[in-house]
């Protein structure tokens, strides 16, 4: 068991040595379905899969039947960063290397709610504060482990005009030396 832990730590070393972001990770279907179910589902809402990645669309093809659907996929000429439709729900797995830009664009689109499947390390107090200052609260969070993905992942759902379920402190504390 201990040897496995040491060998698996090579993942983090390999990530540190990357010269180019490797942001294409297909969301397992079961996880996409779990993420979708965390949302409030209302008839005729417009849902967006911001990075469909392929025609199978783990998210897009599993959105509820009673909603309208749209998608973006840069490889198919529909860039999320150029999207400007009125949207109710954004649900997807963003590229981690573009997280700040992604959050900024999501907030600009002003959905009723949005969810992200992200690495637990991507959920920072600074990002939560930015999202809260835009009028959203963290309403749901689910931690999970996806095989071959680095570390723990989490699904976070933010809702407009909702109080966050967590508290945080942005003060940096120092230990005595």
Segments (PLM) and residue ranges:
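Class I S-adenosyl-L-methionine-dependent methyltransferase catalytic core
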Residues: 2-177
């Amino acid at each position: 068991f201990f040897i496995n832990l040491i060998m698996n730590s090579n993942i983090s070393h390999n990530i540190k040595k990357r010269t180019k972001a490797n942001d294409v990770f297909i969301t397992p279907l079961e996880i996409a379905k779990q993420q979708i179910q965390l949302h409030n589902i209302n008839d005729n809402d417009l849902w967006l899969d911001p990075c469909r990645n392929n025609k199978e669309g783990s998210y897009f093809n599993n959105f509820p039947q009673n909603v309208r659907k749209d998608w973006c996929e840069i490889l198919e000429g529909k860039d999320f960063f150029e999207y400007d439709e009125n949207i109710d729900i954004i649900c997807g797995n963003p590229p981690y290397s573009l997280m700040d830009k992604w959050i900024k664009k999501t907030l600009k689109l002003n959905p009723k709610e949005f969810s992200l499947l992200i690495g637990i390390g991507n959920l920072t107090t600074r990002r939560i504060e930015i999202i809260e200052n835009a009028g959203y609260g963290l309403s749901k969070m689910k931690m999970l482990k996806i095989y071959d993905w680095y570390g723990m992942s989490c699904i976070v759902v933010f809702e407009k005009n909702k109080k966050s379920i967590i508290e945080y402190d942005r003060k940096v504390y120092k230990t005595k030396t």
